[in-house]
């Protein structure tokens, strides 16, 4: 689950990190009234959307007076920002954040995330702050340091010094940076975060270490432990279809292709998407129905897939372990009759009761295309939509 910048900064502040003082609001009048409490020569106005690249899209402005802030806020609120992360449709700005300006001397990059390969927490640091870290990794990889921390260990001063070595800080600033690393680590563990990113992390001309921007993503599977974080969820920033899918306990992510996918198991879903690409088409979604598939769940999944107007065909790929293929097949047949599917539908079943499942599909009277294996299924759905 993602949250807004102003929310991320408040959590960082709670754990001891230093952030600029700021206020957020849903209306211009509210913003201006709150901004009067800020002690600053200049105001930094920021659009609050769940996407990076706001500055280049006109979503970050530096203003000299309250009057300038009011004019800029009126222009920005309700505007649709298009960045490299929003896609061509962009995101509408529905809340604004204004904070005190900072006297920047140097900009750094810092992030903390889970390294699944080593089962450790990894810190990524760079002296190239304010830039897209992927771009830095591609052009100047020597500018990036990665430091792995065992999740069972406390983070030490020595660990912190490794992380911040590339910043080349003087003594007092170095102490501040070490304290910040410990705060980020404590926050990461304490909130069950997947990622904490501070970009840029700055050294001011007054020699203060400050988190100038922040992005946090939380493990959705651990949110039951954090009701206070659940309250920060902004449904306006999420795809309505993905919200609907979550209500039916479906793991769904919309993509840009033309072949809808319904699969049980995340690994099999990824393999299904890969083989669709191998045969020259693009998947329209990732959809994992999980270990159980009632008629209602299959029907909901098909409706969600078909709500995407780009879908020209559907591939259902099921390996029956806990899930019985005959139960899934009956769910597909019942749902297909109810929805009246008009696009080609290829079904591949394997595993528990797959023979019974195939019989149900063959005797359904529906124009379903049966596949023997994943390779066969991918070829058939690609051919069917041509």
UniProtKB/Swiss-Prot annotation:
GO terms for biological process, alphabetical: succinyl-CoA metabolic process; tricarboxylic acid cycle
Domain ATP-grasp: 9-244
Listed GO MF terms: ATP binding; magnesium ion binding; succinate-CoA ligase (ADP-forming) activity; succinate-CoA ligase (GDP-forming) activity
Pathway the protein acts in: Carbohydrate metabolism; tricarboxylic acid cycle; succinate from succinyl-CoA (ligase route): step 1/1
UniProt keywords, alphabetically: ATP-binding, Ligase, Magnesium, Metal-binding, Nucleotide-binding, Tricarboxylic acid cycle
Cofactor list: Mg(2+)
Cofactor stoichiometry and binding remark: Binds 1 Mg(2+) ion per subunit.
Binding site for substrate: 264, 321-323
Binding positions (ATP): 46, 53-55, 99, 102, 107
Residue positions binding Mg(2+): 199, 213
UniProt subunit comment: Heterotetramer of two alpha and two beta subunits.
Family: Belongs to the succinate/malate CoA ligase beta subunit family.
Protein name, as recorded: Succinate--CoA ligase [ADP-forming] subunit beta
Protein species of origin: Pelagibacter ubique (strain HTCC1062)
């Amino acid at each position: 689950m993602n949250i807004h910048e102003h929310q991320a900064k408040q959590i960082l502040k709670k754990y001891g990190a230093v952030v600029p003082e700021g206020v957020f609001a849903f209306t211009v009048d509210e913003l201006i009234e709150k901004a009067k409490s800020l002690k600053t020569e200049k105001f930094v106005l920021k659009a609050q959307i769940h996407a990076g690249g706001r500055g280049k899209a006109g979503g970050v402005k530096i203003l000299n007076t309250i009057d300038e802030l009011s004019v800029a806020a009126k222009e920005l609120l309700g505007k649709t920002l298009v960045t490299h992360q929003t896609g061509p449709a962009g995101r509408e700005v529905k809340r604004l954040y204004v904070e005190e300006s900072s006297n920047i001397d140097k900009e750094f990059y810092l992030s903390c995330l889970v390294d699944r390969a080593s089962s450790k927490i990894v810190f990524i640091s760079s002296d190239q702050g304010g830039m897209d870290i992927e771009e830095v990794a591609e052009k100047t990889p020597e500018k990036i340091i990665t430091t792995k921390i065992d999740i069972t260990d406390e983070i030490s001063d020595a660990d912190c010094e490794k992380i911040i070595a590339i910043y080349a800080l003087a003594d007092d600033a170095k102490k501040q940076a070490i304290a910040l690393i410990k705060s980020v680590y404590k926050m990461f563990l304490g909130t069950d975060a997947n990622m904490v990113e501070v970009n840029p992390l700055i050294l001011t001309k007054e020699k203060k270490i400050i988190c100038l921007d922040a992005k946090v993503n939380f493990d959705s599977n651990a949110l039951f432990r954090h009701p206070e974080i659940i309250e920060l969820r902004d449904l306006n920033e999420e795809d309505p279809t993905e919200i609907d899918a979550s209500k039916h306990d479906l793991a769904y992510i919309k993509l840009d292709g033309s072949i809808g996918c319904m699969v049980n198991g995340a690994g099999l879903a990824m393999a299904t998407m890969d083989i669709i690409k191998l045969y020259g088409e693009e998947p329209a979604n990732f959809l994992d129905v999980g270990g159980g598939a009632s008629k209602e769940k299959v029907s909901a999944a098909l409706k969600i897939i078909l709500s995407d107007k780009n879908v020209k065909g559907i591939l259902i790929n099921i390996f029956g372990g806990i899930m019985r293929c005959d139960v899934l097949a009956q769910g597909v047949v019942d749902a297909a009759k109810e929805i009246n599917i008009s696009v080609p539908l290829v079904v591949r079943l394997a595993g528990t009761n797959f023979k019974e499942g195939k019989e149900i599909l063959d005797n359904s009277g529906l124009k379903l295309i049966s596949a023997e294996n994943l390779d066969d299924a991918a070829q058939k759905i690609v051919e069917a939509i041509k």
